[in-house]
């Protein structure tokens, strides 16, 4: 068994903290929350301190922040229905179009596309058209309820979204007319899907839900060895594993480490749990076991967790309790 060692507890935000995001270099991170401010933190010596506070971009709670793959830009999604793009401590662009709260924002791996989603049930795809210019490339209305999270595939221009309608949707650009289409609907959860994350190679996806489970989904491409039918020659996603009985309340976030393959979950029971794929796991019927659980990681709901993209085993979390914590996994 492994265990999580608490390395740092950081305070600075007023009220609940909704999101944290590691910089691609892994040596700094951004945080956001109820106080309408974004904080950029970096390490000097053995302490983490706020280097910058970005406070003039939004009128309401900031739900999520995400760095561009190059690390030059930061996008923030807010309940004020806008998404702001920041560079060098300035707000360079504000993306408007959603009718109400923007819940999530994500950059494609190339950095050329941005996705946003909202309580208005829509997913928007934006093209980076030049210096601080963003053009709406698509408005996708595949979900029937509030959309909670958008995440791009790690190498392909495929987008995944998770919703209050209990489903996950996949989108890709059509080769025929360059329109964006919903290519798959992933149904198995029995309540809101709060978050999703791809495995490093993008062939599997983990999801977490209000139904207290995690699910692992696998992509089956046309001509797959398993003999899974692929109508219209499109990739089919199947739920190949359900992790149940490990969380006592809603699971709000999940992070699949691109370095170690470990999965971290953030839960409404104030806990953080780490899952590891079993050594005898089968390709089409994988099994994941609980490696370690930090039952009282925070004093209130844990809203987000994210593995450091560079430093294996380092995990960041944030909570309604107004703190950010940095953990080190000892296996």
UniProtKB/Swiss-Prot annotation:
Q: Name one cellular component (GO) term.
A: metallochaperone complex
Biological-process GO terms, alphabetical: iron-sulfur cluster assembly; protein maturation
In terms of Pfam families, this protein maps to: WD40 (PF00400)
Domain of life per record: Eukaryota
Q: Which CDD domains match?
A: WD40
Map the WD repeats onto residue numbers.
12-51, 57-96, 97-136, 142-181, 188-227, 246-285, 297-331
Which PROSITE patterns does the record associate with it? WD_REPEATS_1 (PS00678), WD_REPEATS_2 (PS50082), WD_REPEATS_REGION (PS50294)
Disulphide bonds in the chain: none
Swiss-Prot/TrEMBL keywords: Repeat, WD repeat
Q: Which InterPro entries match?
A: CIAO1/Cia1 (IPR028608), G-protein_beta_WD-40_rep (IPR020472), WD40/YVTN_repeat-like_dom_sf (IPR015943), WD40_repeat_CS (IPR019775), WD40_repeat_dom_sf (IPR036322), WD40_rpt (IPR001680)
Against SMART domains, the record matches this protein to: WD40
Its biological function? Essential component of the cytosolic iron-sulfur (Fe/S) protein assembly machinery. Required for the maturation of extramitochondrial Fe/S proteins.
Q: Which family does it belong to?
A: Belongs to the WD repeat CIA1 family.
Protein name per the record: Probable cytosolic iron-sulfur protein assembly protein Ciao1
Q: Which organism is it from?
A: Drosophila grimshawi
The beginning of the lineage is: Eukaryota, Metazoa, Ecdysozoa, Arthropoda, Hexapoda
- Gene that encodes the chain: Ciao1
């Amino acid at each position: 068994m492994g265990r999580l060692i608490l390395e740092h507890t950081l305070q600075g935000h007023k009220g609940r903290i909704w999101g944290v995001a590691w910089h691609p270099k892994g040596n700094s991170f951004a945080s956001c929350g109820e106080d309408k401010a974004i904080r950029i933190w970096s390490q000097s010596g053995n302490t983490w301190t706020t280097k910058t506070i970005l406070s003039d971009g939004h009128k309401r709670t900031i739900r999520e922040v995400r760095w561009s793959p190059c690390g030059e830009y930061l996008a923030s999604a807010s309940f004020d229905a806008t998404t702001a793009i920041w560079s060098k401590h300035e707000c360079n662009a504000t993306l408007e179009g959603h009718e109400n709260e923007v819940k999530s924002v994500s950059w494609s791996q190339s950095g050329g596309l941005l996705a946003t989603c909202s309580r208005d049930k829509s997913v928007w795809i934006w093209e980076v058209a030049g210096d601080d210019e963003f053009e709406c490339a698509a408005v996708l209305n595949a979900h029937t309820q509030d959309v909670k999270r958008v995440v791009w595939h790690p190498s392909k221009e495929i987008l995944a979204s998770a919703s209050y309608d209990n489903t996950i949707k996949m989108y890709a650009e059509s080769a025929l007319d360059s329109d964006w289409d919903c290519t798959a609907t992933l149904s198995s959860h029995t309540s809101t899907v709060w978050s999703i994350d791809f495995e490093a190679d993008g062939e599997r996806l983990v999801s977490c839900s209000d139904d207290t489970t995690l699910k692992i989904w696998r992509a089956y491409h046309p001509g797959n060895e398993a003999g899974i039918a692929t109508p219209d020659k499109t990739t089919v996603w199947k739920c190949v594993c359900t992790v149940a009985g490990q969380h006592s309340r809603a699971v709000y976030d999940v992070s699949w480490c691109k370095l170690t393959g470990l999965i971290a979950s953030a839960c409404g029971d104030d806990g953080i749990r780490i899952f590891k794929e079993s050594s005898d796991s089968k390709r089409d019927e994988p099994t994941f076991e609980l490696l370690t659980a930090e039952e009282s990681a925070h004093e209130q709901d844990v809203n987000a967790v994210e593995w450091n993209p560079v430093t294996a085993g380092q995990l960041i979390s944030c909570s309604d309790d107004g703190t950010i914590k940095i953990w080190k996994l000892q296996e």
